[in-house]
Design a protein with these regions (language model features):
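Short secondary-structure boundary segments
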Residues: 85, 131, 157
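Glycine/small-residue-rich phosphate/adenosyl-binding loop
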Residues: 41-111
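A glycine-rich helix N-cap at a beta->alpha junction
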Residues: 67-77, 143-164
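A short N-terminal beta-strand-loop micro-motif at the entrance of redox/enzyme domains
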Residues: 13-28
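C-terminal helix-cap and adjacent tail motif
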Residues: 3-13, 89, 151-182
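Small-aliphatic-rich amphipathic alpha-helix that forms the alpha element of a beta-alpha
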Residues: 33-34, 81, 96-140
Length: 182
């Protein structure tokens, strides 16, 4: 499949079948993420894969509690990939202090998108999750001081046929050459 076709086909999946995801497929997705570029090549990411009911429930009961309960649907996914980062890396500290940019967020976005695109190619569904209790989730995962839980990705076999994709803005509304114009 051509890359742009893959990107066009991919959509967020929130309902998964009970069919387990093969560990080799999970490893393939993480391998795609491992190869992602990062600021100064620091590769700040650490991937924690939750692929059994008990682990997902224990994690979800913490990370999706209180105001974050709207993300509890993810507890029905056969896999949740937690993307944690090491904050003490030099590129992260300098970027934040000098430029005000948290490069680890960009790095996680690139690596995570590699995961969801690889999953799509393998016939798996996925959904980014940004609404979770980061501190409680980090504690449930056993993250160390100086680490942060940055993102989650639910992964599995879609339970339903894919719905019609949401419309995206046309290029002429978002693309500008040489200078932004209204």
């Amino acid at each position: 499949m051509k890359f742009l076709e893959l990107v066009k086909r991919r959509q967020s999946i929130r309902k998964f079948s009970e069919q387990p995801v093969d560990r080799e497929q999970i490893i393939t997705c993480i391998e795609a993420a491992r190869l992602a570029p990062s600021a100064e090549n620091v590769q700040p990411w650490r991937f924690i894969v939750l692929d059994n009911r008990q682990s997902i429930e224990q994690f979800g009961n913490e990370a999706f509690s209180g105001v974050y309960r709207f993300s509890r649907w993810a507890m029905h996914a056969p896999v949740i990939i937690a993307i944690a980062v090491e904050l003490d890396l030099l590129a992260n500290r300098i970027g934040k202090e000098i430029q005000g940019t948290q490069y680890y967020l960009i790095d996680v976005g690139i690596a995570g998108e590699h995961i969801v695109l690889q999953a799509e190619e393998l016939g798996l569904g996925s959904c980014w999750i940004g609404w979770f209790h980061a501190r409680k989730g980090a504690k449930a995962l056993g993250l160390l001081r100086g680490m942060k839980l940055a993102a989650l990705i639910a992964l599995g076999h879609p339970a339903e046929p894919r719905s019609k994709k949401k419309e995206k803005k046309p290029l002429e509304k978002i693309l500008f050459f040489n200078r932004f114009e209204r």
